[in-house]
């Protein structure tokens, strides 16, 4: 990789576009290019409000700049939103050593100045280039330039009179072409004033005209608002441009706050950073000290929340950190200024960024409203549900593993239902308990199988789900969180299918059955497209894929749910179809520790307002690293709800092969050194002992190093490379498809990938120009989400792609047109997700129509597709993936995991805990013992959040009682265990039956829970991009939370709620009870 010098230089002069466009195409292979982070999360309601979402950063180009001060022509590599020889730019650059294609790399973004006089004496050449860029034919360009030379002089030609000159040229040449002169003077006047030339609609022409009218926009907006700049100058109205130009000359500080930019121009998450303002000295001179201090304080507040994960900062701490920039009085005034413009919120000497404050409050309000709704009990025998798990194939068996990217949703053919008093009275979930239990009693263990003792924690967890509107389940990998939840809803699905089928068969046998009766098969076919009622979600694409694979049900990312609502609002007027998730009654969120409060707030609010949501289930591990974004959602909800019997921890490991891994994870959470069942010392000539072949938790000990030694870093890399090379000879690491290296630092990942690439494929990860190299056999991962339809080669044949999709073709049914439609839907709906791992199985370069390279990639879960290599790099930004950082691999798991500790540095026990729990069967830890001990002993940095406080306050004020369980009854064989409903043939009146005439809209209070969009405006994400895990201020290094208790949370003691104090008595209405009936009575029957 090219080494860069910290010395910065300012270049100013004409911008010359790249000459060699073919060579430019390879720039996407450079690994040292500044990463373009995906746009920040945007709330669906913000998008629906008509706001303009930020675009991506401009692409990187190689250009030449002729410096006006030294007359030197410098080759520069960086992000230039517009190019052309008629522009002058001013930009900060740093020298780059080791690159043959460019001398300097841009720091930040350029300012643009139009050469309105076309830079004499080059007017002719610049004008020709400009007209060519404006899609004017070469003949017309030559005719125009000849005419200019005859009529006037090139010296008089400039951009200010170019439009009029072109109009005059077209008018005069038009007269010559006409046989008869214009007969009406008014017609001539019309031609002079109203004639619109075709080139006036081209982007280069509009940019030039904008620069003439609004020079400040061209100078400052590319630096201040690089993601919005091109949209503003290309699509923004003249009024908007005029207002922004005026603000840049009077109150530029307003561009530093997204709330103001949204209010004025509907720009979403659009605000300039303080660092960007510092590059515009003339703008700083227009600001008062108060305005500058407010921008500094706002920037510091966002930085603290981003790096430490806080959702608020105490006033004293904030002012203290700014003591070197402003006095205490100035800080107080700045804070008041920020509060007055609505950017921050005060509460008890705490300062919140408004978006985080609103997110935590909105979550608390939504959860409280769910808990106040009339209770909905799933009347199932949870012990028999759990017992049925042991009589079926394991969820993770190869036979049951589903394609993570199948297009067709694996829906319930007769989806589960809940109490809906308006139109769903006959569904099985709303029937009396006697009907449910009668069917459940049919589920029995096979006689030749030994009954497995049930996990009482799992029993209690399922009872919570059946009884409570909100349930939080925490536990380590292998405790069965996902298994029991998916099994519960599959069980209910089977019961409903069985009852519907039996009822249909009985009715068909009736002699009086109508000829119009639809058979069970036909009915099932009609209901195949029934709406989703149990929605499984995860925070990342990879986690959603694993959830889909484990459960056999379709799973979505939270962002997909959010954006699907926006997409629906754009088409609902024409399609007249309901929102895809409008029938959701149960929301399951897996990997809850990774969920940010902003995304969760948005999705929960959408489902509460626009679906029939009645149950929320959150799964995760409270000891894992929290979200990389501010907040600590899972831990806050768990600690708040456990006292109300709505949260529980599963403590028993159900993977026999991973017991030692689970035990060591517990030790690590208690800051104790783990117990290894094998050790391997790395020396000059390490050999792999046979004794570790059947071990589970292996310590690969690196030699201790002297930190003061100059060769310490070199020795560490040498020892690490030797350790990795040695382990690659081990049987469990022979297959890269079932093993994964994990490291904390990205530089360690690079070294491991180099070693693995050479071992598995025989080539290096980079060439002599530090460009990434990919080939057959490479293990790669996507670092961005992208749809398959955006990645397909332009000239791919239908038959070829159909063959690639054979693994999923069983989901395509019907006629050939139906198949074609399904195929298009497949390509449009399938996403390659951030974090998803693929293997390259084929690499073809087609030179027929230019150099086009295609890769065939396989995710080893049923999806194999051929994609365009350049598109794959552009949209997915693929990287080698034999080694991943712990933060990017969190939410995934593998059979064998190798964790490289490296230097302890900022690592603490949660990093080690999260890493080792990624392994299902075997874990290797490569580390110096002292560094491993330091990391385990280091406490995590507690996050300051207010979700717990908001939720406790809201629940207390609303009088929501602790959860209780229906029909309490001690189960056989465990007098002290959790209760389960009895399988009684007699009907049992349950709470949901008593509230049959209470609609959900009456039970909730949306006006109390939700604010208007204007009131809950969210700010932009923190400024700056930090993508390297080993940087001092990496966001990932601060992903901590305050799990300080060494022991696991105590088991929940379930106590039945006293009817005397139950607020649910207010909802009991005995006067409207209606007996449950499968079919409506005829006129002569009693009602």
UniProtKB/Swiss-Prot annotation:
UniProt effect for mutating residue 967 to D: Phosphomimetic mutant; leads to higher localization to the cytoplasm
GO cellular component: cytoplasm; cytosol; mitochondrion; nuclear body; nucleoplasm; nucleus; site of double-strand break
Record-annotated membrane-spanning stretches: none
CDD domains: DEXSc_RecD-like (cd17933), SF1_C_RecD (cd18809)
Motif Nuclear export signal mapped to chain: 1055-1078
Consequence the record notes for mutating residue 1005 to A: Does not affect subcellular location
Catalytic EC class: hydrolase
Post-translational modification: Phosphorylated at Ser-967 by CDK2 during the G1/S transition, resulting in its nuclear export into the cytoplasm. As S phase progresses, its exclusion from the nucleus promotes the activation of long-range resection.
SUPFAM superfamilies found in the cross-reference section: P-loop containing nucleoside triphosphate hydrolases
Key words, A-Z: ATP-binding, Chromosome, Cytoplasm, DNA damage, DNA repair, Helicase, Hydrolase, Nucleotide-binding, Nucleus, Phosphoprotein
Entry's localization field: Nucleus; Cytoplasm; Chromosome
Residues recorded as bearing Phosphoserine in the entry: 967, 971, 1048, 1058
Pfam families: AAA_30
Stretches for region Disordered: 953-989, 1015-1051
Consequence of changing residue 1021 to A: Does not affect subcellular location
Residues bearing PTM Phosphothreonine: 1027
InterPro entries assigned to the protein according to its UniProt record, in alphabetical order: Coronavir_polyprotein_1ab, P-loop_NTPase
A single BP term in Gene Ontology: DNA damage response
Regulation of this protein's activity per its record: Inhibited by salt concentration greater than 100 mM. Uses either magnesium or manganese ions to support helicase activity. Binds strongly to single-stranded DNA in the absence of ATP but dissociates readily in the presence of 1 mM ATP.
Catalytic reaction list: ATP + H2O = ADP + phosphate + H(+)
PANTHER family noted in UniProt: DNA HELICASE B, DNA2/NAM7 HELICASE FAMILY MEMBER
Family: Belongs to the RecD family. HELB subfamily.
Reported function: 5'-3' DNA helicase involved in DNA damage response by acting as an inhibitor of DNA end resection. Recruitment to single-stranded DNA (ssDNA) following DNA damage leads to inhibit the nucleases catalyzing resection, such as EXO1, BLM and DNA2, possibly via the 5'-3' ssDNA translocase activity of HELB. As cells approach S phase, DNA end resection is promoted by the nuclear export of HELB following phosphorylation. Acts independently of TP53BP1. Unwinds duplex DNA with 5'-3' polarity. Has single-strand DNA-dependent ATPase and DNA helicase activities. Prefers ATP and dATP as substrates.
Subunit structure: Binds to RPA1; this interaction promotes HELB recruitment to chromatin following DNA damage. Interacts with at least two subunits of the DNA polymerase alpha complex: Interacts with CDC45. Interacts with TOPB1.
Protein's name in the database: DNA helicase B
Organism, scientific name: Homo sapiens (Human)
């Amino acid at each position: 990789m090219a080494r860069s010098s910290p010395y910065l230089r300012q270049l100013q002069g004409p911008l010359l576009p790249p000459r060699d466009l073919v060579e430019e195409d390879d720039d996407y292979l450079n690994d040292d290019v500044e990463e373009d982070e995906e746009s920040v999360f945007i709330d669906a309601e913000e998008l629906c409000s008509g706001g303009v979402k930020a675009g991506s950063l401009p692409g990187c180009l190689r250009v030449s700049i002729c410096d006006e001060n030294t007359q030197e022509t410098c080759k520069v590599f960086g992000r230039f939103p517009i190019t052309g020889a008629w522009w002058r730019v001013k930009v900060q650059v740093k020298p780059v050593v080791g690159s043959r294609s460019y001398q300097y790399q841009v720091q930040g973004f350029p300012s643009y100045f139009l050469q309105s006089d076309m830079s004499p004496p080059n007017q002719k050449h610049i004008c020709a280039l400009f007209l060519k860029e404006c899609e004017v034919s070469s003949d017309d360009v030559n005719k125009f330039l000849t005419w200019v030379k005859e009529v006037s002089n090139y010296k008089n030609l400039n951009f200010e009179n170019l439009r009029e000159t072109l109009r005059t040229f077209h008018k005069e040449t038009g007269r010559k072409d006409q046989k008869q002169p214009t007969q009406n003077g008014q017609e001539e006047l019309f031609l002079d004033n109203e004639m619109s030339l075709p080139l006036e609609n081209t982007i280069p022409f509009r940019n030039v005209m904008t620069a003439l009218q609004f020079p400040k926009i061209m100078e400052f907006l590319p630096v201040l608002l690089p993601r919005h700049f091109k949209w503003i100058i290309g699509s923004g109205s003249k009024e908007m441009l005029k207002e922004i130009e005026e603000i840049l000359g009077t109150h530029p500080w307003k561009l530093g706050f997204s709330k103001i930019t949204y209010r004025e121009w509907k720009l979403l998450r659009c605000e300039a950073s303080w660092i960007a303002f510092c590059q515009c000295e003339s703008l700083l001179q227009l600001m008062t000290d108060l305005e500058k201090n407010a921008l500094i304080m706002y920037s510091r507040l966002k930085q603290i929340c981003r790096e430490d994960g806080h959702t608020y900062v105490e006033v004293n701490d904030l002012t203290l950190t700014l003591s070197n920039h402003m006095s205490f009085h100035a800080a107080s005034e700045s804070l008041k200024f920020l509060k007055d413009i609505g950017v921050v919120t005060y509460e008890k000497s705490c300062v919140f960024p408004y978006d985080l404050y609103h997110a935590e409050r909105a979550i608390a309000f939504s959860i409280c409203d769910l808990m106040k709704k009339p209770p909905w009990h799933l009347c199932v025998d949870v012990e028999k549900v759990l017992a049925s798990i042991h009589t079926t194939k394991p969820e993770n068996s190869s036979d049951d593993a589903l394609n993570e990217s199948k297009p067709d949703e694996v829906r319930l053919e007769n989806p589960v239902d809940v109490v809906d008093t308006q139109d769903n009275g006959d569904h099985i979930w709303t029937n009396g308990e006697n009907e449910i239990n009668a069917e459940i009693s049919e589920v029995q263990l096979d006689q030749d199988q030994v009954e497995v003792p049930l996990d009482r924690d799992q029993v209690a967890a399922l009872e919570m789900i059946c009884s409570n509107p909100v349930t939080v389940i925490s536990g380590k990998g292998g405790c069965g969180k996902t298994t029991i939840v998916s099994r519960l809803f599959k069980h209910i699905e089977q019961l409903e299918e069985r009852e519907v089928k039996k009822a249909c068969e009985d009715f068909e046998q009736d002699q009086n059955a109508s000829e119009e009766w639809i058979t069970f098969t036909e009915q099932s076919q009609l209901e195949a497209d029934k709406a989703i009622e149990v929605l499984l979600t995860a925070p990342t694409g990879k986690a959603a894929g694993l959830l889909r694979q484990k459960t056999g049900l379709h799973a979505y990312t939270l962002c997909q749910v959010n954006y699907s609502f926006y997409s629906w609002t754009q088409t609902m007027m024409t399609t007249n179809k309901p929102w895809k998730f409008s029938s959701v009654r149960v929301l399951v969120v897996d990997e809850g520790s990774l969920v940010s409060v902003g995304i969760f707030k948005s999705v929960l609010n959408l489902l509460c307002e626009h679906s029939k949501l009645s149950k929320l289930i959150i799964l995760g591990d409270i000891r894992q690293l929290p979200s990389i974004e501010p907040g600590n959602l899972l831990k806050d909800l768990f600690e708040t709800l456990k006292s109300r019997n709505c949260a529980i921890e599963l403590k028993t490991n159900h993977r026999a092969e991973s017991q030692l891994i689970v035990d060591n994870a517990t030790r690590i959470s208690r800051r104790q050194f783990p117990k290894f069942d094998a050790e391997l010392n790395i020396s000059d000539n390490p050999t792999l002992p046979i004794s570790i072949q059947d071990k589970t938790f292996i310590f690969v000990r690196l030699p201790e190093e002297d930190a003061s030694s100059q060769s310490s870093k070199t020795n560490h890399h040498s020892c690490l490379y030797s350790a990795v090379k040695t382990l690659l000879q081990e049987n469990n690491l022979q297959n890269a498809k079932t093993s994964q290296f994990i490291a904390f630092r990205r530089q360690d990942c690079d070294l491991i990938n180099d070693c693995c690439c050479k071992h598995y494929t025989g080539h290096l990860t980079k060439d002599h120009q530090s460009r990434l190299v990919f080939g057959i056999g490479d293990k790669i991962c996507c670092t961005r989400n992208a749809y398959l339809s955006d990645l397909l080669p332009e000239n791919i044949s239908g038959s070829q792609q159909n063959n690639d999709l054979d693994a999923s073709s069983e989901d395509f049914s019907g006629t050939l047109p139906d198949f074609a439609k399904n195929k298009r839907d497949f390509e449009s709906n399938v996403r390659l997700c951030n974090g998803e791992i693929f293997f390259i199985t084929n690499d073809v370069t087609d030179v027929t129509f230019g150099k086009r390279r295609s890769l065939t990639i396989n995710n080893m879960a049923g999806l194999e597709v051929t994609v365009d290599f350049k598109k794959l790099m552009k949209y997915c930004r693929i990287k080698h993936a034999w080694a991943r950082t712990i933060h990017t691999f969190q939410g995934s798991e593998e059979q064998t995991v190798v964790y490289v500790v490296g230097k302890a540095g900022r690592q603490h026990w949660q990093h080690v805990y999260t890493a080792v729990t990624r392994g299902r069967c075997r874990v290797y830890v490569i580390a110096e013992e002292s560094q491993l001990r330091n990391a385990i002993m280091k406490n995590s940095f507690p996050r300051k959040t207010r979700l717990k406080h908001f939720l406790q306050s809201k629940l207390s004020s609303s009088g929501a009682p602790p959860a209780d369980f229906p029909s309490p009854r001690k189960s056989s064989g465990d007098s002290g265990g959790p209760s389960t409903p009895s399988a009684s043939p007699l009907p049992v009146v349950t709470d949901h039956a008593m509230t049959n005439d209470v609609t959900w809209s009456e039970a909730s209070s949306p006006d109390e829970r939700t604010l208007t969009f204007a009131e809950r405006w969210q700010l932009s994400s923190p400024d700056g991009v930090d993508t390297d895990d080993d940087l001092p201020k990496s966001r990932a290094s601060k992903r901590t939370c305050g799990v300080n208790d060494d022991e696991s949370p105590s088991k929940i003691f379930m106590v039945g709620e006293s009817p005397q104090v139950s607020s649910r008595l207010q909802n009991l209405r005995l006067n409207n009870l209606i007996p449950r009936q499968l079919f409506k009575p005829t006129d002569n029957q009693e009602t």
